[in-house]
Amino acid sequence: MSRNLSMRAKVFLKPLVLFQIIDAYDRRPKGDNQVMGTLLGRNKEDHIEITNCFTVPHKEHSENKRIDLDMTYASEVLELNMFAYPNERVLGWFCTGKSVSRSASLIHDYYVRECGERQPLHLLVDASLKNQRLSTRLYCAVEMGVPGGTKGLMFSLVPLEISSENSDLLAMRCIEKQSQQQASKQMERFAPELVQVVDATRDIQQRLDLLLRYINDVLARKKKPDNVVGRSLQAALTAVPLLDSEKFRLMFNTNLRDMLMAITLSTMIKTQLEISEKLSCMQDQ
């Protein structure tokens, strides 16, 4: 593929990537002004999907505004990620800040080798949340200069669209619901996961009631049938395997136990990380 394809192809960004960058910025080492790392995703024929990322440790030199990346760490984490997600490839790098840094061209040279034929993308995220908004901009480097003379790089803006699947939308609705609570409750933990399951089940029940009313109205000739809706319903019904109530109950209970185990383990890990952070702060003091 041509390197210029990155300038023409549509680029879709998954919300998970933004959450990972914000979390890394919030947990950045003391004294660091920004975080940066590698963007991962998939190259399609007509578009690019940024689906994952990981941070790369770096060292900032204030005297010459230069940034050194830990290349060994980046290579090792990338190799591990390829085992877990073999379909993901390096698409470029991300950085937090308000503008493209002076060292962007040097970092660009490293990711040119990692991206192969495709031009690496540069995602700039302003994590300062100015005006309570998260600013995201995507750049692609273009060579410029006089033929036969010194050439440089110009980072041009590339259209970026945040793409969400059904699972992403469900998670973001839960986060939005919690963020709209009173200020006195903002620091409390999320509602128990089972409560969220009940809310989701109630929402599904309301949608099913609406669907049944529509079907009954069509059968009673109160509404005109729609072929598109009919084909969509048929596709949805055929996609769900036919199970009796006992098998469904067994499958649901098994998945519920797995979810509770995952919640317990994640809570233990979270508690361990919080204790580790507090101990690190005590040592710094």
UniProtKB/Swiss-Prot annotation:
Species of origin: Drosophila simulans
Q: Does the keyword Lipid biosynthesis apply?
A: no
Any one GO CC term of this protein is:
eukaryotic 48S preinitiation complex
What subunit structure does UniProt give?
Component of the eukaryotic translation initiation factor 3 (eIF-3) complex. The eIF-3 complex interacts with pix.
Q: Does the keyword Protein biosynthesis apply?
A: yes
What is the similarity comment for this entry?
Answer: Belongs to the eIF-3 subunit F family.
**Protein function:** Component of the eukaryotic translation initiation factor 3 (eIF-3) complex, which is involved in protein synthesis of a specialized repertoire of mRNAs and, together with other initiation factors, stimulates binding of mRNA and methionyl-tRNAi to the 40S ribosome. The eIF-3 complex specifically targets and initiates translation of a subset of mRNAs involved in cell proliferation.
- GO MF annotations, alphabetized: metallopeptidase activity; translation initiation factor activity; translation initiation factor binding
Domain MPN, which positions?
A: 11-145
* Entry superkingdom: Eukaryota
User: Which SMART domains does this UniProt record tie to the protein?
Assistant: JAB_MPN
Q: Which gene encodes it?
A: eIF3f2
**Which keywords label this protein?**
Cytoplasm, Initiation factor, Protein biosynthesis
What InterPro entries does the annotation carry? eIF3f, EIF3F/CSN6-like_C, JAMM/MPN+_dom, MPN
Q: Which protein is depicted? A: Eukaryotic translation initiation factor 3 subunit F-2
Coiled-coil-forming residues are: none
Q: Where in the cell is it found?
A: Cytoplasm
Single Gene Ontology BP annotation? formation of cytoplasmic translation initiation complex
Q: Name one matching Pfam family.
A: MitMem_reg
